[in-house]
């Protein structure tokens, strides 16, 4: 939504997650200049890549424009470091959106249809069948590669916004099967810290999954 600056009501700013987190205005060249400056700062210090949060919201509820902004940032960073690696978080199962994001040229996106407690990895382990996983994987890989021939899908079980895998898979053999499944899926495998131990959600504080 939109909020007024508490010190100057004539200034209105967009903030979709919190009124203390104003959105970047990617239509303003000054914003891009500062983004490029920040990226160069870290690249010059040896950073090999970036994990980009919530790329679908660069323009709120407009993934086509978000993809354009993502392409600008990716191309800008490539000029500084040709082999830079970027992985984006786009919490969506809509293949129109996923492929639009990949058309930005970004190296990788987290594959959300496979993660979380309702994703294909855990569902396959719990059901004892990989048919749905296999069908979804073949389709997902095909469509993403058509959008970006260099796409490297990033697979995971859960992340910091989800309940931990240990909550759903209570048996050790199930946890091992889930790990084997996503670790051997073509692409990049991301392990949320604690998953290698079978950690469960510790329900204390404001963010128990952490």
Where on the chain are the PLM-derived regions?
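Short acidic/polar active-site loop segments enriched in Thr and Asp
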Residues: 48, 189
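Hydrophobic (often cysteine-bearing) scaffold residues that line and stabilize catalytic clefts
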Residues: 31, 66, 190
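Substrate-binding/active-site clefts of carbohydrate-active enzymes
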Residues: 1-45, 69, 73-79, 83, ...
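Ligand-binding/active-site lining segments
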Residues: 156-157
